[in-house]
Amino acid sequence: MGRSLKKGPFIADSLLRKVEKQNDNDDKSVIKTWSRASTILPMMIGHTIAVHNGRTHVPVFITEQMVGHKLGEFAPTRTFKGHIRDKKGGR
């Protein structure tokens, strides 16, 4: 279930200020953020945002297809190492 239209999309104020500042200066340096719940807006297209996954910051390059999604969707928090093999072999 999505967020109410009258409220608008959620984006952290600090992240919004950093993106607007870079857009004014035509700067495309990496922006670090811990806000995985922030929605990707059209003004972020072309920026690289380093999203925290609990251990490190994962760089995410924002494209048009990502608009409307959350930043946390593109920074996985779990590493899948594969299923363990049977010790007995195949029966």
UniProtKB/Swiss-Prot annotation:
Keywords: Ribonucleoprotein, Ribosomal protein, RNA-binding, rRNA-binding
Xref: Gene3D superfamilies: 30s Ribosomal Protein S19, Chain A
GO annotation, cellular component aspect: cytoplasm; small ribosomal subunit
Highest taxon above the source species: Bacteria
Key word Ion transport present: no
Role: Protein S19 forms a complex with S13 that binds strongly to the 16S ribosomal RNA.
Similarity comment text for this entry: Belongs to the universal ribosomal protein uS19 family.
Matches recorded under NCBIfam families: rpsS_bact (TIGR01050)
Protein name: Small ribosomal subunit protein uS19
